[in-house]
């Protein structure tokens, strides 16, 4: 379960090669530089609460693309709710632009502990990012 009922977006490491490439797009926000410096708190709802509130019995594919917050999303799934999921599809960035505070090995350990094993690894073009599909071996 999630450690708190709120979370913060990750800080951007502006010294990375990836950030320098993305700077043209990100420069859109240059009119308000404070936007890039502030920390914004947002309320989160963990996946197990969504599963419970909506009486979800089975999930074929859970797609998670949260720009560096995937591990925290996965931690918001109670162990018994993992049994309802057949596949988990995640994106993982290997560049250092997003200060995540976790490694892909942390995701692997959490998913393996809940009977999910990596089936596919897809490299995304032009980025140090991969998409992974994990399968629940008990489904």
Q: Where are these predicted regions, by residue range?
A:
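Glycine-rich adenosyl-binding loop in Rossmann-like folds that engage adenosine-containing cofactors
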Residues: 1-45
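Conserved acidic-Pro-Pro-aromatic motif
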Residues: 48-139
């Amino acid at each position: 379960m999630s450690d708190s009922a709120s979370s913060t977006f990750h800080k951007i490491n502006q010294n990375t090669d990836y950030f320098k490439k993305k700077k043209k797009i990100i420069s859109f926000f240059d009119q308000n530089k404070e936007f890039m410096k502030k920390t914004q708190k947002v309320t989160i709802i963990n996946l197990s609460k969504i599963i419970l509130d909506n009486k979800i019995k089975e999930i074929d594919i859970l797609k998670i693309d949260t720009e560096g917050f995937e591990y925290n999303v996965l931690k918001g799934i109670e162990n018994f709710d993992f049994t309802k999921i057949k596949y988990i599809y995640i994106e993982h960035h290997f560049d250092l632009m997003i200060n995540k505070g976790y490694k892909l090995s942390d995701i692997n350990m959490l998913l393996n502990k809940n009977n999910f094993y990596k089936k596919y690894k897809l490299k995304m073009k032009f980025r140090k990012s991969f998409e992974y599909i994990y399968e629940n071996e008990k489904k």
